[in-house]
Amino acid sequence: MKKIIFICFSLLLALTGGCSMNDNDKNSTNDNKTEAVKPKDMDPKDLPQVPAFQDEKTREYMVSTKEEEPGYYLLESKLKGFRMLFPEDGKYLSRRSSLTGKNKESIGFNSYDKDTNVMFDGHVTYYKEESFANEPKTMLDIVSGKNDYKGEYKKSSKKKTDIYTAKKKDIFDDIDRKYNYSYSYFGYVKSTEEDNLGVEYAFTLGCKNENQPCSLDEEKAKNKVEKLINSITFLIDKKEK
């Protein structure tokens, strides 16, 4: 199973161009305001010179050209269901993304840090008006199955969400490669403000190029992932309530 996971991750890197729970309540993910002219409608020359804006598909999700934190901008789902921080070097992956009606949306993306030789792969799925989304145990069983995980999840709570998180380190002993490991973080963010509303997430970090030094640090990986998880904010239409 580990060998299959590693091969899948390696293929993902090749196909994509070689390819702490901190409190972020003050982050503007809680602010529904947007720019008068959206980034997707602007001239790329006037946008930040980073992949998140220079990639045509990715900038469709960008809320503003304002940097929320150093290296991070604000992403909004196509269904306008949630917002979260997005790395400036992140790029949207169409083959791992989908839009299903008005109640489900998946967004896949990745980023590559040339300085550290670390590839970051992310995938989030938004659920609305789905009864199973209101059952953390059911959702975590689904997440565990997708990530070949049999352990427990850590729960934390913010003002309007409950966050469930698990992590694991995969070491691929049967692969002849120097950097034969990766760190994965996955779980579920459930709205406590509205029923049947949540976001499933999975993030993996691994070394991309075997013939280059790699600085994959577990603490830095955890901090990066937790920053994104904690930034997830649901956009609830009060008129519907």
Curated annotation (Swiss-Prot):
Compositional bias (Basic and acidic residues): 23-46
Query: Which PROSITE patterns does this one have?
Result: PROKAR_LIPOPROTEIN
For the keyword Transmembrane helix, the answer is no
Known role: Required for complex colony architecture.
Entry GO CC: plasma membrane
Q: Name the lipidated positions (S-diacylglycerol cysteine).
A: 19
Q: Which residues bear N-palmitoyl cysteine-type lipidation? A: 19
Please give the record's induction comment: Up-regulated by DegU and Spo0A. Repressed by AbrB.
What membrane topology is given?
Answer: Lipid-anchor
Its signal peptide is 1-18
Q: Which UniProt keywords apply?
A: Cell membrane, Lipoprotein, Membrane, Palmitate, Signal
**Major location (coarse):** membrane
What is the scientific name of the source organism?
Bacillus subtilis (strain 168)
Q: Which segments carry the region annotation Disordered?
A: 22-48
- Mind telling me what this protein is named? Putative lipoprotein YvcA
Designated gene of the protein: yvcA
Q: Which domain of life is it from?
A: Bacteria
| Gene ablation phenotype (knockout) | Overall loss in complex colony architecture and lack of fruiting body-like structures.
